[in-house]
A protein has these predicted regions:
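N-terminal intrinsically disordered, cationic/polar leader segments
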Residues: 1-90, 95-145
Length: 145
């Protein structure tokens, strides 16, 4: 296990509009505001998303299994923001629902806003953490110093 103790820094409230890309918007806020570590909360609607719902296989490297969410539908999510070698990267897990059916996983692949998405970013200061590429797993994983 790795862990560090930090403090809550700035708290950013954002509203995303119809059709906006969730990852692009949140990562651009982090870039503009120079946020290196944060917790992220979202609530609102998704128009569509490709969602990782577990691994298709684990060997030799993790291959994600995707399911498509065709909205519009409701979403509630929690995630983290840490930099990798290219800048801020959002890691988000969400529960997405429509017509009494739900899908839980890691939305990727062009997750788009339906009507409104309310975002809260809670900056974490005083820690040294970043996403580093793990060759064995083929993924960027969190590394806390």
């Amino acid at each position: 296990m790795q862990y560090a103790t930090g403090q809550a820094g700035r708290i950013i409230a954002a509203r995303l509009f119809e059709g906006e890309d969730v990852y692009e918007c949140i990562e651009s806020i982090a870039e503009k505001e120079n946020i290196k570590c944060a917790s992220v909360l979202i609530t609102g609607g998704f128009r569509k998303a490709d969602v990782v719902v577990g691994p298709e296989s684990e060997e030799p490297k993790i291959v994600p299994k995707f399911m498509h969410f065709a909205g519009p539908g409701e979403v509630l999510g929690v995630g983290t923001l840490y930099n990798d070698e290219k800048g801020p990267k959002l890691h988000l897990h969400a529960a997405i629902g429509k017509n009494g059916e739900s899908l839980v996983g890691c939305p990727r692949g062009g997750a788009k806003t339906f009507l409104i998405l309310e975002v809260t970013i809670i900056e974490i200061t005083g820690i040294d953490a970043a996403r580093k590429f793990n060759k064995e797993k083929g993924l960027n994983l969190l590394d806390i110093k």
